Amino acid sequence: MFYSRTLSDKARRYARRVPKGPRGKNIVGQRVAEARNLIEPAITQDALSGKLARLGIQLDRAAIAKIENNHRRVLDYELKALATALGVHVDWLFGDER
């Protein structure tokens, strides 16, 4: 029956049509991990989560791990907060060496 489809069925079909980035669901994950480890001393995902919380962004350790492993998309305001918390420019997270 056409009308018996659930919203989750429609959402799954839509998710399959949304193209993934060239390296997964985001293109900044590797740089987030790199920036986190370049800080002296390196900070943990939990510590980064705490810095983000102070900026008003709620990303727990698991969400940060998913971002770093390209298994989670990053919203624009999360990207800006990640750059601020890590002390890097947003362009750097995209791979720009500036």
Question: Which residues does each PLM region occupy?
Answer:
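Short, basic-rich loop-to-helix N-cap that marks the start of a DNA-contacting helix
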Residues: N69-T84
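Hydrophobic packing within well-folded, soluble alpha/beta domains
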Residues: L48, I64, L82-A83, L93
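Residues that mark the N-terminal boundary/hinge immediately upstream of a DNA-recognition element
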Residues: R31, T44, S49, D60, ...
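A short, Lys/Arg-rich alpha-helix, primarily the initiator
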Residues: F2-I43, D91
